[in-house]
Amino acid sequence: MSRQVFCRKYQKEMEGLDFAPFPGAKGQEFFENVSKQAWQEWLQHQTTLINEKRLNVFEPEAKKFLEEQREKFFNNDESVEKAEGWKPE
């Protein structure tokens, strides 16, 4: 049986991640509070943002922007950036 977590994005019990997505306390927080589905959706959204905004993920400003967007995404904040001209299916 898969590990279950109370997903902070969907506010319900869902299948959890198999491992922390990155090291440290923040990675552990996501491991404990974000579902596998929500994390996959974030990865898709992040990729769209990187491509549409032509972000260099090695630049501190881009990293900060993505961290802020990640928090907004998982908190269901309406101000999360959307790629211009992109329409979800």
From Swiss-Prot:
**Domain of life, per lineage:** Bacteria
Query: Is Iron among this UniProt entry's keywords?
Result: yes
Gene3D superfamilies in the record:
Fe(II) trafficking protein YggX
* A single Gene Ontology CC term: cytosol
A GO term for molecular function = iron ion binding
Give a GO biological-process term.
cellular response to oxidative stress
Q: Which Pfam families did the record assign?
A: Iron_traffic
Matching SUPFAM superfamilies = YggX-like
Keywords, sorted A to Z: Iron
Q: Please state which protein family the record places this protein in.
A: Belongs to the Fe(2+)-trafficking protein family.
**Record-linked NCBIfam families:** PRK05408.1
Say what the protein does: Could be a mediator in iron transactions between iron acquisition and iron-requiring processes, such as synthesis and/or repair of Fe-S clusters in biosynthetic enzymes.
State the HAMAP family in the record.
Fe_traffic_YggX
Report what the protein is called: Probable Fe(2+)-trafficking protein
- Species this chain originates from: Acinetobacter baumannii (strain ATCC 17978 / DSM 105126 / CIP 53.77 / LMG 1025 / NCDC KC755 / 5377)
